[in-house]
Structure formats: structure tokens, C-alpha cells
């Protein structure tokens, strides 16, 4: 897989932004994880999975930073598309990131109903790359069942949208004219990864992979 070209989606940009925010925040993220991701399931094709622990003592903050990263990344899309994705996920773009979103309310209810104590299972949907390419899917465990639930929802939506090489990993450096060009390119190149489906189920189980 190392010899193939990496296939980027909006989720890659989102997770880069999210990790940056977690790293820059003053609250330490090296606390003992209250929640571990015990299993990741989905349909995988040419997809590498990485689990990263960035556990925080403030679960509300981790969710807020996640919403901030999501809003930043989908700002690259035309307004109609970004509002459709935000509505699908359960985030109101007219609210500030610190407002409790529909997504967060749903995830709070999910964690309570499923009585998640220390091990959590995630279903990330599809992770597929074309022949000769691979996708790196990075899952960030913040130690919060609610935030992990939010991440699960976001990955299912953003991992369907292809990102041309011209914009990959450059989210913090856009100027206004570059953003206009990016929006046009995304409209042209956006593809649904589900069109290259392959029904191949793969499971990650806690304790069998090395955390990084």
C-alpha cells in the first residue's frame, strides 16, 4: 500500500484541522482515556486504518473543536452543498460552534442509551479508493463516547467527497481568490466513493492494533 498514491477526501482535511486544534489547545490531552475504541467496522477497499488517542478531560470542548473543524472544512464547498451536508449531519451553520447541536444531542442520547462505560464500537461506513491508490482513514479517540459518536457521523459524510491534490493539507493558508478556485474545483471533482463499492467488511478490535 505504501507504493500507491494516497486518495484524499474532505475527511482528511477535517481530521488534520481537528488534530491541530486539539494540539494547540491549552488543556492537556494526555489524560488517561476514559473511553477506548474497541471495534471499527465498515466496508474497506484499499484503505488503511489508524487509531489515534487524543483524550481530553473536557468532553464538551472536544465536541466544540470538532464542530469548528467541520465548519472550516465544508466552507470550501458551495453554500448549497455545505448546508445540505451540515443538515444531514445535524449541525446548524447559523449557530456558533459552542452551541449544542442536534448532532451532539443525538450523540448524548446514544451514549446514554447504549450505556457506554469504557469500550465503544464505531461504524464508519465505506472507506474505498480507486485501483492503484489508497486511503488513510484516521480515527481520533478523544476519550468521550459523545465526541466519538460525532466523529462517526462526520466520517460517513465527508469521506464521500474527493479532494483534488491542489487543496490537500492547505486549509489554514487559503486566501479569498484561492477559496473561489477551490470551490469550483470541488464542484468539478467531487465524487461519491460509493460508486467504487466493494462489499468487503473489516473489523478493528481493541488490543490487536497499536495506538499511535
From Swiss-Prot:
Modification note: Disulfid bonds are oxidized in the cytoplasm by OPG088 protein.
Transmembrane domains' residue ranges: 176-196
One GO CC term on file: virion membrane
Ranges of the Virion surface topological domain: 1-175
Xref: Pfam families: L1R_F9L
Mode of membrane association: Single-pass membrane protein
Keywords: Disulfide bond, Late protein, Membrane, Transmembrane, Transmembrane helix, Viral envelope protein, Virion
Disulphide connectivity of cysteines: 33-55, 47-127, 107-149
Segments in the Intravirion topological domain: 197-212
Keyword Disulfide bond: yes
Subunit structure: Component of the entry fusion complex (EFC) composed of OPG053, OPG076, OPG086, OPG094, OPG095, OPG099, OPG107, OPG143, OPG104, OPG147 and OPG155. Except for OPG095 and OPG052, each of the EFC proteins is required for assembly or stability of the complex.
Family classification: Belongs to the orthopoxvirus OPG053 family.
Record's protein name: EFC-associated protein OPG053
Species of origin: Monkeypox virus
